[in-house]
Amino acid sequence: ILSGQIPAGTEMTQNELAESLGVSRMPVREALMILEYQGLIIRLPNNRIKAADLTEETLRQILALGAQLERQAMRALPQDAMLAGGEMLQHRTLRTVLPYPLHRKLLESIQETYIAFAVSARPTPVNDRLARLLMLDRQGSPDVPDAWNAYEEELLHLILTIRSQYAGTETH
């Protein structure tokens, strides 16, 4: 759904989905609960579901919310803490310092669904981006908002590029 292989608005029943995957309805039902939580499907009456319409603006808002929570997490990090490891490990580390379980769960959903999808699409890893954002933030740099916006736009562009490949369209 996120890649665009299943077009927005596509409707199907749990039974149709289970049959097409060759599995029983129970694992499909469990998977659909996760997809609904991640914002990728919408439940309809009579055990039907519909693929969510993930417009560019919707994706931009989701990534902005994730960035807002990650900036909050950066401020909660101990002053001597560093972000190490690959890009996704750095995202996951930030999630652990958020004080409220709801914020951690929301950020987990954004990170593991949308950010991980974008990061996996990158031709070469960029492992120091969050560490550099943390450094800028700790230095009180006025460039922090612009740096975060650039990072969000990069992730958005990666997602839109993959989606356009499946839709046969160009990204802008």
Model-derived features with residue positions:
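Short, hydrophobic secondary-structure boundary micro-motifs
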Residues: 8-10, 44, 103-107, 145
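All-alpha effector-binding/dimerization core of bacterial HTH-type transcriptional repressors
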Residues: 38, 51-112, 136-142
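Short linear motifs at protein or domain termini
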Residues: 1-75, 167-172
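C-terminal all-alpha effector/ligand-binding and dimerization domain
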Residues: 119-172
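N-terminal alpha-helical segment
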Residues: 43, 87, 126-129
